[in-house]
Amino acid sequence: MPSSPDTDRDTDPDTAPARRPRRGLRLALALFALAWIASAVYHVYKPLPPGIGVAGPLRSARDVALLTDLTWTDPQGARHSDQHVFDEALRLIGQARRAIVADQFLFNDFGSENSGEVRYRKLSQELTDALVARKRAVPGLTVVLITDPINTVYGGRVSPQLQQLREAGVQVVVTDLARLRTPNPAWSGLWQLCCRWAGNDSDGGWLPNPLGPGKVSLRSWLALLNLNANHRKTLVVDQGEDWTALVASANPHDASSLHGNVAVRFGGAAALDLLASERAVAALSGAAWPRALPTSVPRESIVDTTSAPRVQVLTEGRIRDALLAAVDGARGGDRLDIAVFYFSHRRLVDAVAAAHKRGVAVRVLLDPNEDAFGRKKNGVPNRQVAAELVAAGVPLRWCDTHGEQCHAKLLLRSGSDGKIELIAGSANYTRRNLDDYNLESSARVIALDDAPVARQARAYFERSWSNTDGRSISADYAKYADDSTLRKIWYRIAEASGLSSF
């Protein structure tokens, strides 16, 4: 029987070589896609480096205080700023005799070049000059500065501040972010395969610098899209025979100098817990830890007392655990006050709404997500979360910003038992900040409600919430209310996927 034309075509040996390259291409694409997916999944769930994501012991502490930066307008509309965080940091640096260890996220003057009539404080140079001056005054002083690669645009620019510190003998450690888990697996899975190994150079590029003036390479942009960071803002110094620490929400970044911020200062063994957490960051970045620095905390310094304030150092995901425990543990008769720059973490949003429902007196003060260094924002995620909380009956106000940001990250639980619990530091209430993607540091304080730190925390929140003393700091919910369905959908997608700047 004669064969059909279709059969002849399928068995024609001349067509087989043409099909083989197509099959090879499909196989190569399938293998590449598999490698991409495998890389993405691994870098979301890979083990954390040693010493990351820790909760230190709850230790008795001395000299515990809440320091604040506030910006407000007076009845005539003039803007004022009252700053204490970096004033205290500079004071502590100026008295150090043995060691200074700082970990600072934004440490640059990017964004201040287009300030117009706004006068920013030159925080990046103030901190640089203070560290250099102290190193010169005390040549044997050990000084370590840990920072994020954003300050060099991921290797694409030379940082004049970091260069000045290196020339003065300061050990500068740029964090190796590739060792961390990724919040943006869709991109980072590919970047880990194709681009991480390409490195970068600071000799200039052809693309605009996304953060400031000048040009950078394509590799800077590709690294930026990983969207993770060493977001810590800490300082540990010796003070006499003891150690003192600051855990802050504030960055030494000129264009951030008008932001509202908070910091917890404490002395004693908990400062050495914070120092140990910074040693872990140096280790994951391949940096040697100076021998002059303590590597352990004396066991006898762990003291459980109900009279003195107690401090616990928290990092990364353990901050989330402490926040959830504080909210879930609040009962009728307790008060829960929250002031935060970004609020989008789903478990925490639900926990706050549930606390209000069971009779806790909840108040939430949010940044309207209106401004970012001269650029207008769309209000995501805070306005969408605010609408949800207000619908649940939670009292909520906005920081009444005028170009600056309400950059604090603070939770204050005032218990009916006469004690307060304060959690403050670098971590915004987002998936990226609380779920072991960024490096973060916060301090948890337990104190009697008449302790100085308790009075300071209550005064800070009341002043911001109630606009006392003729200072306009906050505004009613209606001013920035946003019920857009599209932006609500985008917030949910961005929070779940990591494809966002928050």
Regions found by a protein language model. Give the residues of each.
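Charged, low-complexity intrinsically disordered terminal segments
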Residues: 2-5, 15-502
